[in-house]
Amino acid sequence: MYKNKIIQTCIIYILYIILFSSIIRTKLAKNNIKKNITNIIAYSIRNENKFLVQLYKQKKEKKKLFIKNYELRNKKRINYLKTIFNSLSGSQFPQNSDIDSYNLTPKLKKTVQFFRSLSDNPYNKSQHVILMGKKCQPMPNELKTRQNQVLGCQSTVYIYPKVKLQDDKKVINWLGYSDGLLTKGIVYILIDGLSGYTPEEILKVNPNFISLTGISDFLTMSRINGYLNIMNKIKIFSEQIIKNIEH
């Protein structure tokens, strides 16, 4: 009996040792797992931070390169646009960028000064042009004739001169229409800036003034050509009014 009790006690003791060892190993394993997870997270964060820093540097370098290339492209584009304007408009750019060299009407001069005061942001300027287009007065359908249509525009455009005598002089007020948002804004700039003046004053205006506003920087070549066609149509009407040709 005594031996059996000793054996049972030893077995229970051994089982307790095994159980206790198992518990300790489990805790150690959990601690190791937590430690490993912590190390993995810390390693991931360090690598992620390195990656973000590297990515930021790359973006910064790309931005510098883009700005540098943009400045070069823009310089070439401005020179190219001058050549295009000179050839299409038949008017030469003045030797200096003085606003008075373009023979602008007071209204057009005010418009140029407004666009010059805006930030040099093509999108921002294009939105202002579109907003200006909403100021166009409706044109009666009977005036939307072939004779009043501006050909060679990307959008449909009509221009019509309303002539009145003022101080024994012929003064023109213009009506304009376009189904294109951006083109409509350009139409408004022209009809507003050239309304209330004599045909002689209108004919003196150098169409290349659009380059002073920065608008030509974001126009496609087809829209630049369309703008010059609108100006040409206005000048043809002005010449006809001087010659007493009725509309």
From Swiss-Prot:
Annotated localization: Plastid, Apicoplast
Phenotype upon loss of function: Essential for parasite survival.
GO CC terms of this entry: apicoplast
Record: active site: C153 (cysteine persulfide intermediate)
Record-stated family: Belongs to the SufE family.
Subunit structure: Monomer. Interacts with SufS; interaction enhances cysteine desulfurase activity of SufS.
Main function: Participates in sulfur mobilization (SUF) pathway for iron-sulfur (Fe-S) cluster biogenesis. Enhances cysteine desulfurase activity of SufS. Probably functions as a sulfur acceptor for SufS.
Stated name of the protein: Putative cysteine desulfuration protein SufE
Source organism of the structure: Plasmodium berghei (strain Anka)
Gene: SufE
